[in-house]
């Protein structure tokens, strides 16, 4: 995720660091431009990229806010069904599950500190986290297209 941000944790095979060992927000990660093309408009974001296992595990844990046009993207390599939870994530988030062609497969709004699982329901190339309600406020819907240079293509 991104000024002070918050993110969900990918659930499933994890690196050696146990989630219980993460006790504070990770420093902001490098950002990259990303665009979302909706029916009405193109929206431009600068999002943090969680590339490593640890960066993906820590995500937006303990972050207090997500900038309006910020967020965090989690590339899924290999491409797979993504399962996220909100363990130690103190703000609610929108999760956009993105296919290899860039289309949004699913959008969910996850509650803060919820250890329930949000799943993509199908193999995806990436998951984008935005502040809760941001997708709806901008009119972003399932089927809209995400353009990001780092999107895994399969």
Task: Kindly give the residue locations of the regions a language model identified.
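Bacterial N-terminal signal peptides
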Residues: 1-13
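Compact, glycine-rich, soluble single-domain proteins
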Residues: 19-154
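Sec/Tat signal peptide C-region and signal peptidase I cleavage site
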Residues: 14-18
């Amino acid at each position: 995720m991104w000024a002070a941000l918050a993110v969900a944790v990918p659930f499933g095979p994890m690196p050696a660091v146990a989630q219980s060992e993460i006790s504070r927000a990770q420093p902001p990660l490098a950002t990259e431009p990303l665009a979302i093309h909706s029916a009405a408009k193109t929206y431009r974001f600068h999002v943090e990229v969680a590339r490593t296992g640890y960066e993906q595990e820590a995500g937006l844990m303990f972050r207090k806010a997500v900038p309006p046009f910020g967020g965090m993207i989690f590339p899924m390599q290999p491409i797979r069904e993504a399962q996220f939870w909100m363990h130690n994530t103190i703000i609610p988030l929108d999760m956009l599950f993105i296919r290899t062609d860039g289309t949004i497969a699913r959008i969910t709004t996850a509650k803060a500190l919820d250890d329930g699982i949000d799943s993509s329901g199908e193999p995806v190339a990436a998951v984008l986290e935005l502040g809760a309600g941001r997708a709806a406020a901008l009119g972003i819907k399932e089927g809209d297209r995400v353009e990001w240079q780092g999107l895994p293509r399969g």
